[in-house]
Amino acid sequence: MASELPMFGQGAGVDRAACLPGAERCAGLRGLDLSMDALKQAQAPLRSAPTRPFLPQESPLSMLPCRLDRAADVRRSPVLAGATLIVRRLFIFVGTALLTLAGGYGMYDVVKVGGVTFLEALLLGLFLVLLAWVAFSFMSALAGFFVLLTRRQPNLPIDTTGPLPHVTSRTAMLLPTYNEDPHHVMARLRAMYESIDATGYGEQFDWFLLSDTTDPDIWISEEMAFIELRRACGGDQLYYRHRSDNTARKSGNIADWVTRFGAAYDHMIVLDADSLMEGDTIVRLVHAMERTPSCALIQTQPVIVNARTLFSRLQQFAGRVYGPLITAGNAWWHDGDGNYWGHNAIIRLKAFAAEAGLPELRGRKPFGGHILSHDFVEAALMRRAGWAIYMVPAVRGSFEEVPPSLLDFAGRDRRWCQGNLQHLAVLPTRGLHWVSRLHLLTGIGSYVTAPLWLLFLLVGLLISLQAHFIRPEYFPKGFSLFPTWPQQDPVLAAWVFAATMGLLILPKLLAYLVLISNREERTGFAGSGRVLAGVVCEAFVAALLAPCMMILQTKAVMEILAGRDAGWQVQRRGDGQLARGEVYRKLAGPTLCGLVLSVCAYSVSLPLLLWMSPVVLGLLLSIPLGIMTSLQLSAPGVFATPEINEPPAVVLRANELAAAEPTEMAGALRQLSRDPELLAEHLGSQSPASSRRFGPVDVPLATATAKVARCESLDDVLAWFDKLEMRAVLENPTLLRRILELPAGGRD
């Protein structure tokens, strides 16, 4: 809100000497009126009433930060695992343990020849940790194969084909956005609005576009697009809120809405800026919440759509083929102890507000501060209080998009990595369900395993280099004429390697078998032969990309451990086109690693280089792979999915709306000066300025106020103001009106 002014000196500073192109037309800051009277005048609440408010009447709902050092005050009856669920979990964990022990014993046989050295012991330890990770994923996939093949009833049955159920509760649809393309955001929102309206239950839903946008031009463009959306839909249930204080990012955005409007609703469905959901699916989720009062959250499995580049098509195909197997297996043994992915999920507001308020973590960034990966933690806190959390992979009609290139994916992965490593501070939270702790550990492990795999490769290479170049120093205790040379059994090592690769590849084959056993799915993919070709091609390209991702994730972990914060960058979407210089700069590291590994391996022997060729080749090809996979595909080819062959109605509608020519935007101030309706709506949406006499100084507002006094035209303002000052102007009705009263042209 405009009254929540930052402390003097916080945030990006204003360069008082640099007036840039407007320096000749505008005087410098020296001598400008920075008096308190001038600032008070700028902060005076002068507003113009809009034709229709951007927001409904507030209905506050208390949401306080929870305590991590004290167990929740559970007033609900605890959900206990039944015998069936215990057996399911024993299957997963006993199977994981047996596979790990068998593989570990095989690896011990490989290195024990001639005695186990320190490096060999380290290699064995790393192998056990990594194999346990692979085996755990394999067992969940095996469970998913059993569930899908036998078509077992899910833990939370939702009828996805019968008549639409009757719903009576009120649900808020929340779409947070941060510097996204307003035209595309509104296209998706309108497509979902129309889809729900077609069900006949449109009156039960209110829609909130929750903007954390910091770019002034995008902010005003959002308001303009929102007014057009309201005009097109006639929607009295469409609302827009811009938050000037971006505290806690997305989780803070949602929490702000809950505390202001949450009491008016029973549920909320949280979306991402790239989310799409069918109205039929949304109504069925609401009905499931109504008939399951013990449930706090139902998470759908979003299907990837609108993939246009090779990289995004790979993700779309893999997610569509392998995703159902993995999520079905997880849901089978998670039951009501599931997880939350942050979007495309329905949440009971009473449970969320009471239990999921997030505290700030102690310490400095990147480990301290606001919790970035909030979704896992929010689910764990609600589960701690006795609420059930369900994953429903069988529910269709939930969609999302993915980054279009390897570098965009790595950028998002960097933020997720920091958020997941923050969970190390959440793990000791008192009262968490053990499955919730496992979810947190799994998220941490998904990034920590990358440096562990790299370390495993390096230790293996060191053992080979040591045996080849360095005199042995491994003497047994007591007198001996001969040293203990590092030795391995190469034949057994090949078998252990093959078995490990089998655990990685077999889930893909199981997913393929499930798919071709379902006639509807097989037809949607245009035949089993085409799917098999896609599986083979996806596995090949993914194997080439995996070493590069290993290096990028290792770099991310190292940066976080060194205290480097990821910040909050805008998610790049669209066609995935990359500047060659950016690709060379960001993928030079993996390429150099591949060169070093290949030289070291070849210095030992050609067979060792061939043994390491899958890793070395992927690293050496990082740059061409980064470029090639970011190219657009004219046809889906073997990576076609049912959503490409026959796009769902809501996806078609969103794409149709997005393809329409957007309204031309002239820049924030010029657009407001030309559009009285937009100006009235913008002024009316602003919160009243604070009337307090003393307090922190808003530096951008202060400098903007001083500069306005020396500007004689709108052109002067546009030339001299930076984005922080422009944003301060847009948040201050009086100062904005003063600027818009200036003539358009500059001084002669």
Swiss-Prot record:
<comment type="pathway">
    <text>Glycan metabolism; osmoregulated periplasmic glucan (OPG) biosynthesis.</text>
</comment>
<dbReference type="Pfam" id="PF13632">
    <property type="entry name" value="Glyco_trans_2_3"/>
</dbReference>
<dbReference type="GO" id="GO:0009250">
    <property type="term" value="P:glucan biosynthetic process"/>
</dbReference>
<dbReference type="InterPro" id="IPR001173">
    <property type="entry name" value="Glyco_trans_2-like"/>
</dbReference>
<dbReference type="GO" id="GO:0016758">
    <property type="term" value="F:hexosyltransferase activity"/>
</dbReference>
<keyword id="KW-0808">Transferase</keyword>
<comment type="function">
    <text>Involved in the biosynthesis of osmoregulated periplasmic glucans (OPGs).</text>
</comment>
<feature type="transmembrane region" description="Helical">
    <location>
        <begin position="494"/>
        <end position="516"/>
    </location>
</feature>
<dbReference type="InterPro" id="IPR029044">
    <property type="entry name" value="Nucleotide-diphossugar_trans"/>
</dbReference>
<keyword id="KW-0812">Transmembrane</keyword>
<keyword id="KW-1003">Cell membrane</keyword>
<protein>
    <recommendedName>
        <fullName>Glucans biosynthesis glucosyltransferase H</fullName>
        <ecNumber>2.4.1.-</ecNumber>
    </recommendedName>
</protein>
<feature type="transmembrane region" description="Helical">
    <location>
        <begin position="587"/>
        <end position="606"/>
    </location>
</feature>
<feature type="transmembrane region" description="Helical">
    <location>
        <begin position="127"/>
        <end position="149"/>
    </location>
</feature>
<feature type="transmembrane region" description="Helical">
    <location>
        <begin position="443"/>
        <end position="465"/>
    </location>
</feature>
<keyword id="KW-0472">Membrane</keyword>
<keyword id="KW-1133">Transmembrane helix</keyword>
<dbReference type="InterPro" id="IPR023725">
    <property type="entry name" value="Glucans_biosynth_gluTrFase_H"/>
</dbReference>
<comment type="similarity">
    <text>Belongs to the glycosyltransferase 2 family. OpgH subfamily.</text>
</comment>
<keyword id="KW-0997">Cell inner membrane</keyword>
<dbReference type="InterPro" id="IPR050321">
    <property type="entry name" value="Glycosyltr_2/OpgH_subfam"/>
</dbReference>
<feature type="transmembrane region" description="Helical">
    <location>
        <begin position="85"/>
        <end position="107"/>
    </location>
</feature>
<feature type="transmembrane region" description="Helical">
    <location>
        <begin position="608"/>
        <end position="630"/>
    </location>
</feature>
<feature type="transmembrane region" description="Helical">
    <location>
        <begin position="529"/>
        <end position="551"/>
    </location>
</feature>
<keyword id="KW-0328">Glycosyltransferase</keyword>
<dbReference type="GO" id="GO:0005886">
    <property type="term" value="C:plasma membrane"/>
</dbReference>
